[in-house]
Structures are given as C-alpha cells and as structure tokens.
C-alpha cells in the first residue's frame, strides 16, 4: 500500500468509527418487539442516506447488537437463506407479527427519540 493511501485511510478512520458507534447506539435503542429499517437507523444516527453503511456494519460485527431488529424498507427481511430464517424466528420470538414475508410495520415500527442518544 502506498504511503499516501495509508495516510488517507488514517484520516478517515475517526469519522467512520464515530459513525459506526452512532449506528450501534441507534440499533441498541430498538426495543424488543419493534423494528427499524436500515434507512431509519442511519437517519436517527445523524447520517441520512447511509443505509448501506448500516448494513455493512451489521455484516462486519453484529455481536452485542440486536441485529434482527433492522430490516429492509417496506418490512422485508433482506438476509437470504438460513440467516433470513433465523432473523424471522428471532423477531417472532420477540412478538413481531408478519404479513406474508413482511413485518407488519404499522404495528412494530420503532419511533426513534434521537434526543435520548446524547
């Protein structure tokens, strides 16, 4: 790796660490029986339009986070195969109801209180 690329990555690192911490805080605030979309988590953390970064964070490290409570827009479970089945099972165990393959958003959508994040 070239020196200038290393320096560039180091300059970015504090920003991405702070962003990931904000996402994690938002995810932890989602109570049992409620869900939020990737976009809602990103917006609540102060980074609207960063929904893909929320997904990337959950792919990298979901230990200690209630990852199952983060879903796709429209209530879809975005994970495929066994992981998707596990997410659905975990949500059902928390009392989340589905309409077909989608979470009943009207009943289970979490309303973030961002003023509680500070």
Where are these regions (language model features)?
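Nucleic acid-binding interface residues in structured DNA/RNA-binding domains
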Residues: 2-118
């Amino acid at each position: 790796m070239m020196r200038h690329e290393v320096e560039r990555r180091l300059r970015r690192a504090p920003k991405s660490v702070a962003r990931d911490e904000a996402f994690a805080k938002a995810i932890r605030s989602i109570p049992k029986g409620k869900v939020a979309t990737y976009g809602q988590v990103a917006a609540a953390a102060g980074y609207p339009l960063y929904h893909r970064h929320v997904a990337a964070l959950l792919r990298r490290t979901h230990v200690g986070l209630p990852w199952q409570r983060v879903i796709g827009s429209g209530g879809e479970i975005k994970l495929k195969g066994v992981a998707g089945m596990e997410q659905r099972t975990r949500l059902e165990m928390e009392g989340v109801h589905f309409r077909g393959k989608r979470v009943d958003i009207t009943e289970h959508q979490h309303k973030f209180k961002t003023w509680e994040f500070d």
